[in-house]
Structures are given as structure tokens and as C-alpha cells.
């Protein structure tokens, strides 16, 4: 284990995505000496001042070649092949915080996995997870969690929902903004836009990661990540239009007919996707840094 006699050391795997810079800055504010490990394909001025290790975080050989026998007080794994990273760094770090995703929950992509159809509302960390009879991606996400705790039993694992904000490579709200910029007077959405979904503003998601770093006693378990308020589609549309000074009618249609809304909704079947954040608040001490209603307009 690390025995550094000066500042604590922190390794951030990733560091240049939607939540990376805020995580790096938060660790520095906690007096950690931060190193970023990523491929080097997407550099960012916000984290250019810290040590960078460039390599392949997706393979065992790549992680070993990049990190060798280096040790760290804290590892925050936001990128790469998590099951490989967890195994290679076993015994080389004091604390391990990792980021996964809500597809670990059974039915997150396909709510027909439940009878009657629909995810549990709210979905807590103990909800059924995806199995081999679910879609392959969801099962692999859940299986990776198992492999993580095999190698890092005291890890804190965070289940990200869809993250929005700066540097998001697939900004769903662009589907709304583009129509506003085009001067459209209406937008088609399923079921009058009443579906509610927990998402996470990038600054808020990074704050959960930092709360996890601050709470080592919570090791060995998973936590949901998200804004404290789960907005409906119609609310997101209204907030964006208000910010841009545009009026646009929400035209509700049955889900089967609202095909133009598929890229915005990112799901075929209707249903709420609301995460239970009770443990995140009560155990990790999380509270929104930016409210969902404010963040949507940023």
C-alpha cells in the first residue's frame, strides 16, 4: 500500500470527459497529487497541468505497461476496461472508486423484462440486476461489477445514469436545441413528455465521485448517481425553450407513433427511469451542487 510521506497520490483513469476535470480539480482541492491515465487522444487544457500517463486502459498488457508497480493512495476509474484495471491494481492502491452505469439494472434498456412492464420506481441499489438472459451489454455491465469486487472488495462503485453537460459526446438535449435553432414551433414526444428520468449534470456526478473519495467507510458497495430531481421530458423541453427565449408546442403521441423522438428518448418502450438516491445522500452526504432545473439551461 502507498506510504507517501508528502501529499497523498491519486490516479484518475480518464480525466478528460464530462466529469473528469471536476474530479481532478476536486482531488487537488483535497491536497492530492493527481496523475491522469488515458489514451492521450483527447487532451484538455483544464487538466494539462497534472502528470499524464498515456497508454491503453482497455487491456491487461496496456495497463501493466503504463502503470507498472506504481502505487496510489486513491484510484478513480472512470474509463477503460474496469475489470482489467481492478485486477491489475489489486494491492497497488489504498482506495478504489469506480464508475459504471445504470444498465446494470435489469430492465433499464428494456422495461418489458418486468411484469407488469416497467422498472421499479424508484430503482434502488438492491434492485434486480441484468443477467445472461438480458441483452449482452447490460449483462456485461453487471458482470463487471462482480469482477470489480472480486479484486477490490473495499471499492465504492458508482452507477452513472445519462450524464449531461460540457464535453458530452452524445448530448441528448441537442435534439431539442436544434429544433429551437431551426425555429420549429412544435416537437413530437411520446406520451405528452410525461416520462421522468434521473440524469446527472456533469458537475453533480463528479461531486458524487468526490463524496465517495471522502467516505472510505462506505467501501464494498454500489451507489446510484443522479440529480436530486428527476425531470420529465416535457419539463426539460420547457426549461430549454425558456433559456433560449423560444416557444415550442409539445405534441404528445403514443410511443409507437412518436418515432422522431427516439434519438431524444433513447428507449423504445415507455416508462420512468428514476433512481433512488437515498443512500447516496445519507451515506455519502451528497447534495446537488447545481439543481437539475438550473443545469438544463446551462
Segments predicted by a language model, with ranges:
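Conserved Rossmann-fold cofactor-binding substructure of NAD(P)-dependent oxidoreductases
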Residues: 51-77, 86
Amino acid at each position: 500500500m502507498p506510504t507517501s510521506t508528502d501529499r497523498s497520490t491519486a490516479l484518475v483513469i480518464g480525466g478528460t470527459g464530462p466529469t473528469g476535470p471536476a474530479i481532478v480539480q476536486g482531488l487537488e482541492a483535497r491536497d492530492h497529487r493527481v496523475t491522469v491515465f488515458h489514451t492521450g487522444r483527447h487532451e484538455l487544457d483544464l487538466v494539462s497541468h497534472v502528470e499524464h500517463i498515456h497508454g491503453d486502459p482497455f487491456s491487461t498488457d496496456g495497463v501493466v505497461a503504463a502503470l507498472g508497480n506504481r502505487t496510489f493512495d486513491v484510484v478513480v476509474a472512470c474509463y477503460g476496461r474496469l475489470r482489467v484495471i481492478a485486477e491489475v491494481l489489486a494491492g497497488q492502491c489504498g482506495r478504489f472508486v469506480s464508475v459504471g452505469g445504470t444498465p446494470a439494472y435489469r430492465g433499464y434498456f428494456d422495461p418489458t423484462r418486468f411484469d407488469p412492464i416497467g422498472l421499479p420506481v424508484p430503482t434502488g441499489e438492491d434492485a434486480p440486476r441484468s443477467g445472461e438472459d438480458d441483452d449482452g451489454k447490460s449483462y456485461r455491465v453487471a458482470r463487471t461489477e462482480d469482477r470489480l469486487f472480486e479484486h477490490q472488495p473495499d471499492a465504492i462503485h458508482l452507477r452513472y445514469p445519462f450524464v449531461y453537460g460540457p464535453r458530452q459526446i452524445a448530448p441528448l438535449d441537442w435534439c431539442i436545441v436544434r429544433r429551437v435553432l431551426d425555429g420549429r414551433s412544435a416537437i413530437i414526444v411520446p406520451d405528452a413528455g410525461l416520462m421522468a428520468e434521473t440524469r446527472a449534470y456533469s458537475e453533480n456526478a463528479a461531486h458524487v465521485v468526490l463524496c465517495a473519495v471522502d467516505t472510505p467507510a462506505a467501501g464494498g458497495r454500489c451507489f446510484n448517481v443522479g440529480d436530486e430531481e428527476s425531470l420529465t421530458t416535457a419539463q426539460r423541453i420547457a426549461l430549454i425553450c425558456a433559456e433560449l427565449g423560444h416557444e415550442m408546442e409539445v405534441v404528445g403521441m403514443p410511443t409507437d407513433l412518436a418515432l422522431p423522438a427516439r434519438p431524444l428518448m433513447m428507449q423504445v418502450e415507455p416508462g420512468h427511469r428514476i433512481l433512488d438516491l437515498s443512500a447516496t445522500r445519507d451515506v455519502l452526504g451528497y447534495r446537488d451542487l447545481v439543481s437539475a432545473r438550473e443545469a438544463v439551461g446551462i
